[in-house]
């Protein structure tokens, strides 16, 4: 593809040479046979190269044809095997991707791109220990390779080694200060570990790069809420809900905060907004049922929400207590 623009100049030069030769020959001889021969030669030349171009375009049909052709023509080069492996990875053909990456590594066992890519495939197959092994090998070859630190962090997280994951995410960020997903993942992981200050710091750094990311604002709101900064949490939840009108959780969490501060009318509104977006959230039906029972003494509405909560999640914790409350309220309901 990179030769297309330079070929314009090459084509002009070749065409000029043909024109010069053609005109020179006509000047030297006025014979019609020569002119006919020149025309015929040019036509045959164009037909030949057109056929070659058509055949060559088949190679450029897609990534598979291109890199398969490249590896057959240059079997000693690593890049065609690696790129063909990535193409198989994209379509989910992981077994074939492994074969291609292993062939690349047979040429150069220290090829860190191939080691990292092979680790990714094993990670997608949930073979996390094998994945970690290849990420480590990649990092031995290139200790500052940020994607391998990120990938090994994800693998550590998935097998429960959360502190190791934190350290690896920090390394990924150290070598690439603009690694957005590393900031995002580290922020959520830090919150899991109750490191709320680090979580807030990383969410803020991520949001500087992705200010319109609804779930990042939601995560920052959660971290603020866990720190007891309820006003800041409410602010982030509002931003999150505004950025993604189909995201119900910010409204649910705003309602939870409003319940803490006894702002019952506002809590009801936000719970109902959440249900409008996602009507099958059993926990919100339960919360509204309890609100209308305990704070509004509205038995019909309380019953409606409680029954929906039980219908949507029959085996939820406390299901027996909900059933008992429904029976109790049914007996209290005016006839």
Predicted regions and their residues:
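Conserved alpha-helical positions within TPR/SEL1-like repeat arrays
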Residues: 79-90, 112-124, 147-158, 181-192, ...
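Polytopic membrane enzymes that build or remodel cell-surface glycoconjugates and lipids
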Residues: 1-136, 144-151, 178-181, 185, ...
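Terminal, low-structured helical/coil segments at or just beyond the last alpha-helical repeat
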Residues: 293-335
């Amino acid at each position: 593809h990179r030769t297309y623009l330079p070929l314009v100049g090459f084509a002009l030069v070749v065409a000029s040479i043909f024109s010069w030769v053609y005109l020179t020959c006509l000047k030297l001889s006025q014979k019609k046979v020569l002119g006919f021969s020149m025309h015929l030669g040019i036509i045959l030349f164009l037909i030949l190269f057109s056929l070659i171009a058509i055949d060559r375009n088949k190679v450029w049909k897609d990534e598979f044809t291109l890199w398969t052709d490249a590896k057959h023509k240059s079997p000693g080069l690593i890049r065609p095997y690696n790129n063909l492996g990535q193409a198989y990875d994209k379509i989910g053909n992981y077994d074939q991707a492994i074969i291609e990456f292993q062939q690349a590594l047979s040429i150069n066992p220290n090829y860190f791109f191939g080691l990292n890519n092979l680790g990714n495939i094993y990670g997608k197959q949930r073979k996390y220990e094998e994945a970690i092994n290849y990420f480590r090998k990649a990092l031995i070859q290139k200790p500052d390779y940020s994607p391998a630190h990120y990938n090994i962090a994800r693998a550590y997280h998935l097998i429960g080694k959360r502190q190791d994951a934190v350290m690896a995410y920090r390394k990924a960020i150290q070598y690439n200060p603009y690694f957005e997903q590393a900031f995002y993942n580290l922020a959520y992981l830090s919150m899991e570990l109750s490191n709320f200050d680090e979580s807030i710091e990383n969410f803020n750094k991520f949001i500087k790069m992705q200010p319109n990311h609804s779930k990042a604002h939601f995560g920052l709101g959660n971290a603020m809420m866990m720190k007891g900064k309820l006003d800041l949490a409410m602010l982030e939840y509002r931003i999150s809900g505004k950025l993604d009108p189909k995201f119900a959780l910010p409204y649910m969490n705003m309602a939870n905060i409003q319940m803490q501060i006894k702002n019952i009318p506002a809590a009801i509104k936000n719970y109902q907004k959440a249900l409008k977006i996602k009507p099958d959230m059993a926990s919100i039906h339960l919360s509204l049922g309890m609100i209308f029972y305990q704070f509004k003494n509205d038995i019909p509405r309380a019953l409606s929400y409680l029954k929906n909560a039980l219908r949507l999640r029959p085996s939820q914790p406390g299901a027996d207590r909900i059933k008992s409350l429904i029976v109790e309220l049914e007996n209290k309901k005016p006839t």
